[in-house]
């Protein structure tokens, strides 16, 4: 039975051994929008009003999400009480839609233009939406699996190249990997129609990218079944692991930075500047440490669950094709 403390310890150890490559991989994931996209938000959140006196009025533009831009273009107001279905969808489908279309957010900006008119703009916007979905399904999903392969390999050997994250593309397994991730996404979208099912299945299907990373030739349905099998009895414990990592490395740093930024800003008379610096500091912490550390910790969790399946000679454990991924990680830093 795995313990949270040991999982975190292994994650830190793995990060310290390959920190440069891990930072590079996580940065690529954030830059493309495959994962950790929120970690780079601070780049565009530095307040330009920070260079002005705090008592000067500055009019700032309110940024809308891709989902909100789409509803605005369709003239749908989910808050007016006449569209309860759209209001409910915004809570579940909205964030998923924003994630899938993140790489092509620029096209959604067309929807916000005051002079938006003409079929050309409409076609461009539709092409942007279709392109964003295509890019997310067929490219970003493979990058996500490739990143899992990188972290699995970096767990058992040093000096791993970031080229490992591109293995789904150049080893002839791209089609099967993307099919598996697409099937997982379809299941998740269907489960959003339920209240309790979605968070449960979110954890049940969590190991699918790792399974496909280890065995890119695994059948999508078998990868999903094996993930459910691995997470059986571990969903709550995994949720607690997520919660502790969030509290320790997201909530508390943000809260502390906010308090320090506001306090120092009040003392110096530059509240906006200090708060902006605090936001950048938290963002850099995520990019330079937290993302890599958490990814390494989740890789250690997969290795522990994988070993438990092998020890029990569980069904579908034959899908684990790389024995080294089940070995104990090196202890040296």
Task: List PLM regions with ranges.
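Hydrophobic alpha-helical membrane segments
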Residues: 1-333
């Amino acid at each position: 039975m795995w313990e949270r403390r040991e999982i975190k310890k292994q994650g830190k150890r793995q990060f310290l051994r390959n920190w440069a490559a891990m930072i590079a991989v996580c940065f690529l994931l954030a830059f493309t929008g495959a994962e950790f996209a929120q970690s780079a938000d601070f780049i565009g959140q530095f307040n330009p009003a920070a260079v002005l006196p705090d008592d000067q009025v500055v009019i700032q533009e309110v940024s809308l999400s891709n989902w909100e831009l789409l509803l605005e273009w369709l003239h749908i107001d989910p808050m007016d009480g006449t569209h309860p279905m759209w209001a409910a969808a915004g809570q579940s489908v909205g964030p998923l839609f924003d994630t899938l279309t993140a790489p092509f957010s620029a096209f959604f900006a067309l929807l916000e233009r005051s002079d938006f008119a003409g079929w050309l703009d409409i076609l461009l916007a539709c092409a942007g939406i279709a392109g964003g979905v295509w890019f997310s399904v067929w490219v970003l999903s493979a990058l996500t699996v490739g990143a899992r392969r990188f972290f699995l390999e970096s767990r058992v050997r040093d000096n791993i190249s970031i080229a490992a994250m591109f293995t789904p593309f150049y080893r002839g397994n791209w089609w099967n990997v993307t099919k598996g991730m697409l099937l997982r996404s379809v299941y998740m979208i269907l489960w959003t129609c339920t209240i309790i099912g979605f968070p449960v299945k979110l954890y049940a299907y969590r190991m699918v990218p790792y399974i496909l990373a280890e065995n890119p030739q695994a059948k999508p349905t078998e990868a999903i079944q094996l993930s459910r099998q691995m997470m059986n009895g571990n969903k709550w414990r995994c949720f607690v692991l997520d919660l502790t990592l969030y509290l320790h490395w997201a909530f508390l740093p943000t809260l502390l930075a906010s308090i320090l930024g506001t306090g120092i800003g009040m003392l110096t008379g530059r509240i906006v500047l200090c708060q902006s610096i605090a936001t950048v500091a938290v963002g850099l912490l995520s990019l330079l440490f937290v993302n890599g550390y958490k990814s390494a910790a989740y890789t250690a969790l997969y290795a522990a669950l994988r070993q438990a399946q092998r020890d029990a000679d569980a069904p579908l454990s034959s899908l684990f094709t790389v024995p080294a991924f089940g070995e104990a990680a090196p202890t040296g830093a």
